[in-house]
Each structure stands twice: as C-alpha cells, then as structure tokens.
Design a protein with these regions (language model features):
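Adenine nucleotide-associated cytosolic modules
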Residues: 1-217
Length: 217
C-alpha cells in the first residue's frame, strides 16, 4: 500500500472526492489525497494545460495541450493505478455525487464559485462538506462548509471586482499551490477522522502568520 506510513493517521479510503477546478489548487490536493489513501474521485474542468500552468500546478511540459482532467488523471494513476476517477471535461453543471461525499472548490473566479454553490444548494443530496480554497502568490484562504447554503456562503464571498488583490488572482506560486493542497488534505483528514478542524484559515507566506477561526471539535 502506498499509504502504509499514514494509514493509521488518516483512513480516507471510504470517501468520494469531487475536485472542481484542476489547476493549481485542484491538482495539488488531488495528488496529495491519492498519496494519503484516497481512491475515488470525480474531476471537473473544461480547460487545457498551458505553459503557465506548469509553473504552479502538478503538470509538466508533456501535459501542455491536454485537458487538465486527462492530464491530472494520468498523474494520479501513476501514483496509484487502482484508484477510480470519473473525469468531466466541462464546466460544473450538476453534482455527480451523494450526501457523504466531499467537494473541493479550486477555481480562479469568485463568480463561478457562487454559481456552483447555487447549484449545490438545490441538490437533494449535496456533499457533506465543501472546502473552498483561494490562493494568490503569497496568501492562501480556506473556508469549510457543512450542508452548504447560499446564505452561508455569501458571508465569506466577494465579487471578482471587489476581491482581495491576492487570493483568486492570475498571480500564483508553486509553493502556495503546494501548501493549499496540504491544508486541504489535512482538513479532510481531520473531518473524516472526526478530529478538530478550523472552518476558516488564512496563511500569509510573507509574514508566515497563520490566522485560524471557528474551531469545530
């Protein structure tokens, strides 16, 4: 087993993970979850890998021109060929899951995030948890929602025009994207293993300050 060293710490094998957006955040969390023992995934992204993606995501130059979903599937299968992956090369239009799954939002656009949350809120079997990761070059933000509603999400949402100059911009760094995957994977481990987790975290690389709020125990 590839997760021999972590299987007693994190048993996430019974969870289906939905990764919406397979760019910097999505590719990082997907590959880390595979290494941690995740074995059932649904990947959503309509875009293709471009050269700038190589510098901030889990892709390489051989992936350029491929769909992000296809390229990420290849990388995940190279880690563990036995995992199950459903790839949807399209925008998120409806939720392919049930109430016990976990969904990760890793998009660049705040408006796209809100549209997805509105779709999820209408689902009879929405995911048990939605983890919203937002990153810039030097700062990462993360919000966790259980039984998500639009009203709940609006409290932490802002428009693309009013967004912070850091999170969800075109600027990005490899270390911030890798750390985003680590934060999300750790939060998922805590949720699944019924350990305490923070519903909101903000980490700034320039100051190395981690701000944590709303501890759930």
């Amino acid at each position: 087993m590839i997760n021999t060293r972590s299987q007693d710490i994190a048993d996430i094998s019974g969870i289906k993970f939905h990764i919406v957006g397979c760019g910097a955040i999505g590719s990082s969390v997907a590959t880390q979850l595979v290494r941690l023992g995740g074995n059932n995934f649904v990947l959503y992204d309509f875009d293709k890998v471009e050269i700038p993606n190589v510098g901030v995501s889990q892709y390489n130059e051989q992936d350029v021109g491929l769909s992000k979903v296809g390229a990420l599937t290849n990388h995940m299968k190279k880690i563990n060929v036995m995992i199950e992956i459903e790839g949807i090369v399209d925008k998120f239009k409806y939720y392919h899951g049930d109430k016990d799954d976990i969904l990760v939002l890793g998009l660049d656009s705040m408006s796209a995030r809100m549209e997805i949350v509105k779709l999820l809120a209408k689902c009879p079997y929405k995911p048990s948890f939605v983890i919203d990761g937002r990153m810039g070059a030097e700062q990462y933000q993360q919000y966790i929602y259980d039984n998500i509603t639009v009203k709940q999400y609006e409290k932490d949402w802002y428009s693309d025009e009013d967004s912070d100059p850091e999170p969800c911009t075109r600027k990005a760094t490899s270390y911030c994207s890798n750390m985003s995957g680590s934060f999300i994977s750790n939060s998922i481990k805590n949720i699944v293993m019924k350990q305490p987790y923070f519903k909101q975290i903000i980490f700034n690389f320039s100051t190395m300050i981690l701000d944590k709020k709303k501890l759930i125990s």
